[in-house]
Amino acid sequence: MIRRIQPIQGIAVIEFTLASSVLFVLLFSIISIGYLMFSLQAINDVTRKAARLAAVCQISQSQQIASSVAASSVIAGIDADSIEIEYLDQDGAVLASPTAQNVRFVRARVVSLTYQLLSLLDFLGESGLIDIPSFETTIPSESLGIVPNGTNTNC
């Protein structure tokens, strides 16, 4: 008796399902890591904007600067409390009561931020929650809101 071997049907669908599921997981992981890199660059941009504004605006407006920079950020987790603006002397020490005469540098930093990864990457960090390192920008002070004729500017 001769048995006929029948071709297995449906194996291509199973192979496609297995291969496509692995490729989709890989694709979404790459997208998630890409968005993390974009977020880190946007946080760096926030520190740069805050430092620039603090260098040209009045010292008393540092909280308003932090609020406006946080509001214009493309990252949702940044608020005014996570942006610190500090005024430094010529040695780089933080001034307790800065004035336009003793400020030589301005430092802006973003602190206490976390990033939630895509649920596929929950094995990273604590359930996908990653602590973002502190970003800071230090630049020389400029006008600090004082114009040559002695009047103050309003940033």
Predicted segments, located by residue:
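Short, conserved structural patches
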Residues: 49, 53-155
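Alpha-helical assembly-interface signal, strongest on the long, hydrophobic N-terminal helix that forms
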Residues: 1-71
